[in-house]
Amino acid sequence: MIKGTRYTNGTEVITFSKIDFIVIGGRKIDHVYFRRKNKVDLIMPLVEWNLKGKFEWLITN
């Protein structure tokens, strides 16, 4: 994934920011961070993004 890549689900546009981990129950789980226009980040587990997100959010570049 390239920083700055934009995706949309038809109602809003999100911009890929970074991949980082969050510790949940002693396990490091990779999460994907996206910027939104309203300045509230969208944070989604990488596994969930790979399974579902890429199909729901189409690349708009």
Can you annotate each of these PLM segments?
Residues K39-N61:
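Intrinsically disordered, low-complexity, charged/polar segments
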Residues T11-T15:
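Short, charged beta-turn/beta-strand-edge "cap" motif at the junction between a beta-strand
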Residues S17-L46:
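Basic/aromatic-rich interaction segments and small domains that mediate binding to polyanionic partners
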Residues M1-G10:
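Short coil-to-beta transition motif at edge beta-strands of beta-rich domains
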Residues M1, D30-H31, K52:
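Coiled-coil-like amphipathic alpha-helices with heptad-repeat character
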